[in-house]
């Protein structure tokens, strides 16, 4: 399958949902992409949904009440099918109309919001699934092109000052505040934009994980809402 992800060692490309959920992550591959060119007017759906807050969860019932053109109906069917596939798989997908995420501006030397390069963590075996139907799309980055922020000396020193407790409790402090999940891109790093319409499965940091978790970030919105499926 020829596409812009084919030669990327971090990304495995599949042609079906079954392949997406059954293919194992291995070596440096910690992101799987069900590559799709979707036919439908997702912008029409966004224009007819009501943004109630910065992140508005859209229910199936809300989708079904929209009066749409033929292209809009096609887009809705794709979304409903994706939601059903993931639900049948045992996931808990959420469709979000998104203006922006909350920013973490508490400290000037480290941020723990989703606009920062980060990994997801879970106490049980799971993966992150996401698909952007409209708007700016997320990025991923190879693990060897980032540095864990807590290992950067000047950041680590400031975190130790912030901790102000016994050295033996410092690592727990980092985990409890999610500082250890965040990364900084190295100079000349080459992030990969996930694009529109593809359904992605990203590796999560959990006890049974065989590969490094996928480092990713939310995009800065371009003044328009995003329509995002995530679980």
Where are these predicted regions, by residue range?
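Catalytic core of non-heme Fe(II) oxygenases with the double-stranded beta-helix
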Residues: 111-189, 195
